[in-house]
Regions:
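Carbohydrate-interacting/catalytic domains
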Residues: 1-6, 17-25, 31-34, 38-206
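Catalytic and substrate-binding clefts that recognize carbohydrates or anionic sugar/phosphate headgroups
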Residues: 10-13
Length: 206
């Protein structure tokens, strides 16, 4: 999927987890598993889970599995498997686990109302969710090149002047014009909480 491009995979998953609705991952997506296009019809995307570097990816001891494990190329089980990715803190698997945990910590996405914000760039999507006096804001750059742009959170008062990045330490403070200036790398994304991290104290103020 997406040629195994880690940047685009992260963008796609980040987008899925921050759009309204229920995110769905099929087994192997968390590893970046590929498809075997030599197989017929939907079987090509239903190859066995690649658990380890053991024969048949650790999926079965059978010499003739019903559907063969992907064994060759960049998606072969020796290159893409759960066991090795669990030990690698920078792997796709561990990144996916972190993004799922963070998604569970932003109930605004599931319960709140959303608004699309103006960025002045058709390649950049900015969406804000509001729920129980709290807001989260997500940015996604669909272009392969970096994009620098200004935008307003759309929230009155000083609370909108501060954006706390939920995934890294790359926070943002509004300029004198009340707008935030952000540079997103190609296929980049940001998850922000508006105002600060004291949101749990504000949920009772509604």
């Amino acid at each position: 999927m997406l040629g195994g491009d880690r940047r685009r995979l992260e963008l796609a998953y980040s987008l899925m987890f921050t759009l309204p609705g229920t995110p769905v991952l099929r087994y192997g997506d968390e590893l970046g598993m590929g498809d075997d296009l030599s197989l017929k019809e939907r079987t090509c995307c239903r190859t066995p889970m690649q658990w380890s570097t053991e024969p048949n990816g650790g999926f079965t001891k059978s010499d003739k599995p019903v559907v063969p494990v992907i064994s060759d190329g960049p998606y072969g089980y020796e290159h893409v498997n759960a066991a090795e990715q669990r030990r690698d803190p920078n792997s796709m698997l561990n990144w996916t686990e972190r993004i799922i945990r963070m998604r569970k910590e932003v109930p605004e996405v599931g319960w709140g109302e959303f608004e699309i914000l103006k960025t002045g760039d058709a390649a950049v999507l900015a969406i804000r969710y509001d729920w129980r006096n709290n807001s989260v804001l997500f940015l996604h750059n669909f272009a392969k090149d970096p994009r620098e742009f200004e935008f307003s959170t759309g929230i009155e008062g000083k609370i909108g002047d501060r954006l706390v990045n939920l995934l890294t330490a790359d926070h943002s403070t509004a300029g004198e014009n009340g707008k935030h200036c952000v540079c997103l790398e190609g296929y980049g994304y940001r998850w922000y909480r508006v105002g600060g991290l004291d949101y749990l104290l504000k949920r009772t103020e509604f």
